[in-house]
Amino acid sequence: MRKLVVGSRRSKLALTQSQQFIDKLKAVEPNLEIEIKEIVTKGDRIVDKQLSKVGGKGLFVKEIQHELFEKNIDMAIHSLKDVPSVIPEGLTLGCIPDRELPFDAYISKTHTPLSQLPEGSIIGTSSLRRGAQILSKYPNLEIKWIRGNIDTRLEKLQTEDYDAIILAAAGLRRMGWSDDIVTSYLDRDTLLPAIGQGALGIECRSDDEELLTLLSKVHNDEVAKCVTAERTFLAEMDGSCQVPIAGYATISDQNEIEFTGLIMTPDGKERFEYTMNGTDPVELGKTVSNKLKEQGAYEIIKRLNEQH
């Protein structure tokens, strides 16, 4: 196998999960020589604005995909939730490895349970999806925008006027934070995850047979089926980052895929949700999308997209 160059965002989390994936590859192919090339993306350069207000898809991947096309790197290790549902022609997701915990972590300054936070308590999140679902269940709470990496957000929780923050559990775990700092992990009924949350997507050129063969050795087919249902739903709903959209699939005991799709308004007042089982992930994602459109969810999406 030739020497491989991996493209990664420059953040501590991105570099850590890239190294963890490289270790996984070396476990099946010990003699691999791999180097990481750090790439700064548009999303990394925007630190003073809410990403949903910037607009556009692929804020964290476009520059990395460009490096793949230019053959400056051989593969890219993405957080799958950052990858738009349509992959450019000539590139492919060469593998979906094991998924980390896909749920969100709720961290309270005083370790107060979410259901017991006093009226007017301020929760920090940079995600419309999280904000909408929290306001839907707890309209007496206040959502305040927060940006920055995990360390920055944890520091802001202590030094600014946040009573609690919500972060992806996967990032905390990959960075080695213990469960001690987490007040609770929020289950799917409290906070349905983002599309592909906790999963990685390994992107490479579609014609790189040698690399695709290597990547197949660390591919998790069950996770791939689940995230395919989720990503199909996202593509069918045409959900941009202005739309609170969530979707989560699991494999049932009967070996079927169970998928829940969710569309909301940012204020949490309108909610469209549907769950169903199936065996074909693409069909499942499309069917749930159609069910939500029948309920009126597409009107929300059109309205929110027109506002921006």
From Swiss-Prot:
Q: Which key words tag this protein in UniProt?
A: Porphyrin biosynthesis, Transferase
EC number(s) in its UniProt entry? 2.5.1.61
Q: Origin organism of this chain?
A: Staphylococcus aureus (strain NCTC 8325 / PS 47)
A GO MF label? hydroxymethylbilane synthase activity
Q: What class of enzyme is it?
A: transferase
Q: How is the cofactor bound?
A: Binds 1 dipyrromethane group covalently.
- Which residues, renumbered to this chain, carry the PTM S-(dipyrrolylmethanemethyl)cysteine? C241
Write out the similarity annotation. Answer: Belongs to the HMBS family.
Subunit and interaction comment: Monomer.
Catalyzed reactions per annotation: 4 porphobilinogen + H2O = hydroxymethylbilane + 4 NH4(+)
Q: Output this protein's name.
A: Porphobilinogen deaminase
What is any one GO biological process for this UniProt entry?
A: heme biosynthetic process
Q: What other note does the entry give for this protein?
A: The porphobilinogen subunits are added to the dipyrromethane group.
User: So, what pathway does this thing act in?
Assistant: Porphyrin-containing compound metabolism; protoporphyrin-IX biosynthesis; coproporphyrinogen-III from 5-aminolevulinate: step 2/4
Q: What are its GO cellular component terms?
A: cytoplasm
The answer, when asked if Lyase is one of the entry's keywords, is: no
**InterPro entries recorded for this chain?**
HemC (IPR000860), Porphobilin_deaminase_cofac_BS (IPR022419), Porphobilin_deaminase_N (IPR022417), Porphobilinogen_deaminase_C (IPR022418), Porphobilinogen_deaminase_C_sf (IPR036803)
- What's its job? Tetrapolymerization of the monopyrrole PBG into the hydroxymethylbilane pre-uroporphyrinogen in several discrete steps.
Q: Spell out the CDD domains in the cross-references.
A: PBP2_EcHMBS_like (cd13646)
What's the cofactor?
Answer: dipyrromethane
Keyword hit for Thylakoid:
no
